[in-house]
């Protein structure tokens, strides 16, 4: 059996500190080195988010002036402060100062300013900052967490500005054979899949969704893997053929096309549909509760289309567990059974009661 090494994260560092801490600084240094965590700033942020105040206070003196300015922004945002413009400008000045300069953090802070400008309606200013930040981070910290975020934020801004083709171009910079995080690749391919589908490029849309599903699994992002997997199936439902090449082979053989090349025809082997469906079903949360359950909605809809409603027999017998009104409405019409229709109609009435 293949052994998968799960990467250590700043969150793991905090967990280890809670198990064995407090410890001396030398021990913290050893943990940081063993976990291959790039900076104390990453650990400080995790300590803030995970409410490890004592660890944060121990790490804080290790931060550079630019890192302290950055963590100050993080803390203010956590406390709900939305008026961060002056604090961001001050942090940028610290990161630019020759005595305290930090090229990577300057890129991150310009990204922060771009997001703040977008929130305040300054679209052009946001575009300038996000593009500048992405170029800087590409040059000094390519494929780092901050560089990945800058690419995803640029693409999101372009989508918000109704420029999907430009967003698609940004997503293409996140290569699958580079050093980008699997989570970043998965997010980018979900976005690219939806754009391609909107353009009618169904083969590319399905290919991107397939890749997103695979990389989300590698990133241990189960919810994202289910989102990508159901997207792949939904895109493929009208194009299933037992004679189709397996999707992974089609993906591996896909090559960039010239303008004059025709769009490949999407044909999907039913074994790939079954494999993705079975994985998604096996990895659904144990609970059916929650007012917003797009995962269950998608899976129930797909199950109806591919004659696999028996996978949800237990769900159909537990109407009181369902809190999503849209899901209840979908389940009500899944079976041609009077009692089933009545029970779920009653549940839907309760959920939609004003």
Give a label for each model feature:
Residues 1-24, 229, 236, 241-354:
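C-terminal non-catalytic interaction modules
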Residues 57-61, 89-97, 131-142, 169-179, ...:
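Amphipathic alpha-helical segments of tetratricopeptide repeats
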Residues 29, 36, 65-68, 99, ...:
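Residues that mark the junctions of alpha-helical repeat units in TPR/alpha-solenoid scaffolds
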Residues 45, 74-77, 115, 156, ...:
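Residue-level recognition of tetratricopeptide repeat
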Residues 6, 33, 62, 103, ...:
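Inter-repeat boundary and helix-capping residues of tandem alpha-helical solenoids
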């Amino acid at each position: 059996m293949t052994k998968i090494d799960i990467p250590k994260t700043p969150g793991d560092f905090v967990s280890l500190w809670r198990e064995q801490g407090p410890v001396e600084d030398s021990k913290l240094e050893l943990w940081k080195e063993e976990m291959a965590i790039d900076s104390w700033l990453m650990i400080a942020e995790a300590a803030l988010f995970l409410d490890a105040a004592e660890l944060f206070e121990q790490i804080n003196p290790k931060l550079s002036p630019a890192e302290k300015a950055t963590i100050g922004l993080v803390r203010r945002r956590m406390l709900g402060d939305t008026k961060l413009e002056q604090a961001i400008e001050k942090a940028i000045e610290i990161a630019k100062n020759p005595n305290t300069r930090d090229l990577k953090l300057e890129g991150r802070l310009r990204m922060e300013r771009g997001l703040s400008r977008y929130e305040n309606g300054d679209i052009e200013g946001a575009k300038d900052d996000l593009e500048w930040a992405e170029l800087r981070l590409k040059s000094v910290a390519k494929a780092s967490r901050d560089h990945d975020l800058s690419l995803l934020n640029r693409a999101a801004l372009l989508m918000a500005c109704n420029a999907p083709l430009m967003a698609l171009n940004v997503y293409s910079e996140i290569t699958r054979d580079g050093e980008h995080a699997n989570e970043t690749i998965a997010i980018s391919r979900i976005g690219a899949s939806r754009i391609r589908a909107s353009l009618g490029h169904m083969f590319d849309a399905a290919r991107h969704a397939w890749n997103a599903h695979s990389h989300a699994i590698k990133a241990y992002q189960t919810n994202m893997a289910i989102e990508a997997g159901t997207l792949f199936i939904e895109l493929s439902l009208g194009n299933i053929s037992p004679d189709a090449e397996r999707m992974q082979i089609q993906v591996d053989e896909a090559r960039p096309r010239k303008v004059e090349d025709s769009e490949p025809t999407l044909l999907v082997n039913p074994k790939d549909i079954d494999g993705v469906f079975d994985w998604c079903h096996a990895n659904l949360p144990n609970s059916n509760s929650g007012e917003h359950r797009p995962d269950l909605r998608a899976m129930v809809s797909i199950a109806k289309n591919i004659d696999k409603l028996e996978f949800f027999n237990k769900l159909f017998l537990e109407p009181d567990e369902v809190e999503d009104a849209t899901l209840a409405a979908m389940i009500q019409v899944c079976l041609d059974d009077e009692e089933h229709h009545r029970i779920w109609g009653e549940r839907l009435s309760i959920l939609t009661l004003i």
